[in-house]
Amino acid sequence: MTNYYAEITGWGKCLPPAVLSNDDLSTFLDTSDEWIRTRTGIENRRISHVNTSDLATVAAKQALARAGITAQDIDLIIVATCSPDSLIPNIASMVQKNLEIEAAAAFDLNAACTGFVYGLETGTRLIQSGAYRHALIIGAERLSFYIDWAMRDTAVLFGDGAGAVVLSRTEEAVGLQNAKIGCDAQGRDILSVPKFGTSMDRFAADNGYWDFNFVGKEIFKRAVKGMGSAAAHVLAHAGMSKDDINVVIPHQANIRIIQTLCDLSGIDQSKAFVNIQKYGNTSAATVPIALCEAVEQGHIKAGDNILLAAFGAGLTWGAGLVKWGQRVEAISESDAALPECDKSALELLKNAIELCNARRDK
């Protein structure tokens, strides 16, 4: 029987143009650029003027062009997101519609910030079954929709964006070699939006104002433990040591978590690709955006061993070992772009900030 693998043949990203800086946040929160940078590593984040599916579509078009295939070649679409345009139907179907794909399997996957790693594992195994030839794996979020802009601890962390990869079936031993995903359910309440969905009071007067539970110290401890143990597992399973890893693509949640993960794993911090300073935490989109930029900037070379690691609400966690193929250059480029935005980030958030502050003052 033929052994199939799922090579990453295309990569793309989409970042909305409106930039919300730390200084912008200090105009309506008790914070400062220094306070945010020293605690998180974040300097800016993006605020979207369009829906999550629009971000996902642009990232997908870039990935398709770089893979040198057409949308009609895709027979599987997985969108990792916890901020979809709608609950019913899924937004993978919207991406499929936007790309004018006639027939493909399409579904959303919610593992919060670990979503892309879960999606990559799922897509890879489906391709290895022999049933699919080309898959789009997308991480896309519009987290600004959820944020309580009167709550400093979370308002400074998150941003909007999308990243995508194309997986293509091959007999060469490249792509995701193995992964370890899991969930620490005892910590599910320390990072959550608990009253969104059927648990909410549908007719309550304050619908639309969701509590965002965030217990930072406990999240830090559990995140490092979950990612660290998953990373150790995939290396042991592959018979590799830390020295065999060329590049680490970690979830971009907090610079201190990234540094601690590397230190505990014995991996030099210089091997970790970091772009949290530009985009903040884009949840399921952080890993594919970082992967895309690592390729674009020449950090990933042909044949590299790449360690992915992430954690998220649930508390989900996961790591994966990717063997890069021989091609690091795009076959072609796409001119896909979002519609123009004529507002600043603060202008886009004006009503949300006012309403969140009014609720806090009640």
Curated annotation (Swiss-Prot):
GO molecular function terms attached to this record? 3-oxoacyl-[acyl-carrier-protein] synthase activity; beta-ketoacyl-acyl-carrier-protein synthase III activity
Q: Where is the active site?
A: C113, H251, N281
Q: In which pathway does it act?
A: Lipid metabolism; fatty acid biosynthesis
User: Where does the protein end up?
Assistant: Cytoplasm
Please give the residue ranges the record annotates as the region ACP-binding. 252-256
| Catalysed conversion reaction | malonyl-[ACP] + acetyl-CoA + H(+) = 3-oxobutanoyl-[ACP] + CO2 + CoA
Q: Which UniProt keywords apply?
A: Acyltransferase, Cytoplasm, Fatty acid biosynthesis, Fatty acid metabolism, Lipid biosynthesis, Lipid metabolism, Multifunctional enzyme, Transferase
Query: A Pfam family this protein belongs to?
Result: ACP_syn_III
Q: Where is the signal peptide?
A: none
Which major enzyme category is it? transferase
Task: Name the EC number(s).
Answer: 2.3.1.180
Among InterPro entries, the record links this protein to: ACP_syn_III_C, ACP_syn_III_N, FabH, Thiolase-like
Sorted alphabetically, the Gene Ontology cellular component annotations on this record are: cytoplasm
**Record GO biological process:** fatty acid biosynthetic process
Q: How does it assemble?
A: Homodimer.
HAMAP family in the cross-refs: FabH
- Family, per the entry? Belongs to the thiolase-like superfamily. FabH family.
What is recorded about the protein's domains?
The last Arg residue of the ACP-binding site is essential for the weak association between ACP/AcpP and FabH.
What does the protein in this record do? Answer: Catalyzes the condensation reaction of fatty acid synthesis by the addition to an acyl acceptor of two carbons from malonyl-ACP. Catalyzes the first condensation reaction which initiates fatty acid synthesis and may therefore play a role in governing the total rate of fatty acid production. Possesses both acetoacetyl-ACP synthase and acetyl transacylase activities. Its substrate specificity determines the biosynthesis of branched-chain and/or straight-chain of fatty acids.
What protein am I looking at?
Beta-ketoacyl-[acyl-carrier-protein] synthase III 2
Lineage per the UniProt record = Bacteria, Pseudomonadati, Pseudomonadota, Gammaproteobacteria, Vibrionales
